Amino acid sequence: MLDREGYRPNVGIILINERNEVFWGKRVREHSWQFPQGGIKPGESPETAMYRELYEEVGLLPQHVKIIGRTRDWLRYDVPNNWVRREWRGSYRGQKQIWYLLRLTGRDCDVNLRATRHPEFDGWRWHQYWAPVDEVIDFKRDVYLGALKELSSRFLRGMESYEDFAARQSSDNR
C-alpha cells in the first residue's frame, strides 16, 4: 500500500535499555545492521503495527516494553532505484515512518530473533545511542538522525547531543 507520493507507510522502533543503549539488529545473511522496522497493514494503526513488528523481528511482547514516545510526524526516505523491486519501479519512492522510542522492561533473554518462521535478524547487540547514524545504510541516515534527535530531545533529558557525540568520536579517532 503506497500513498499518493509513492511512500509505503511504515513504523520504526528504537528500543533502549536502562543505560539508554539502542537495540541494533543484524539483517539475516547480510553484513548490514538496522533498527527494527516494518510496514503498516491496511486498517492497522501505527501502534498496532509497531507491536506486531516488535514481535516478528525481536520476539518481544507488549509486557516486555514501555512506550516512551513517538515522532510527531512521518519521516521519509527515498530508496535508490537499484534497491527497488522491478515491478514497483515508477510508483514506489520509499518509506514514510512513524518512529517509536521503547524502553525494555523485560530482560535481554526475552529477545527471541526466531519468534517467527521468517526472521529478519540473525544477530543483535546493544549499541551507543548515536552510533547507528554512522553505521546505517546511506539512504536511511537522515531519517535515523531525525528520529534519534527528536525522540532524545523530547523524552530523554540529559542525553548527549549527536553533535557532541560526533565531536567526541572524531577526537577519539585522532
From Swiss-Prot:
| Annotated InterPro entries | Nudix_hydrolase, NUDIX_hydrolase-like_dom_sf, NUDIX_hydrolase_CS, NUDIX_hydrolase_dom, RppH
* SUPFAM superfamilies, per database record: Nudix
* Every Nudix hydrolase domain range: 6-149
Which key words are in the record? Answer: Hydrolase
The reply on keyword Coiled coil is: no
| Entry's EC annotation | 3.6.1.-
Report motif location: Nudix box: 38-59
Q: Record's superkingdom?
A: Bacteria
UniProt cofactor(s): a divalent metal cation
Q: What class of enzyme is it?
A: hydrolase
Query: Which family, according to the similarity comment?
Result: Belongs to the Nudix hydrolase family. RppH subfamily.
> What job does the chain carry out?
Accelerates the degradation of transcripts by removing pyrophosphate from the 5'-end of triphosphorylated RNA, leading to a more labile monophosphorylated state that can stimulate subsequent ribonuclease cleavage.
Q: Which NCBIfam families match?
A: PRK00714.1-2, PRK00714.1-4, PRK00714.1-5
Q: What's the name of the protein?
A: RNA pyrophosphohydrolase
Give the organism the record lists. Answer: Neisseria meningitidis serogroup A / serotype 4A (strain DSM 15465 / Z2491)
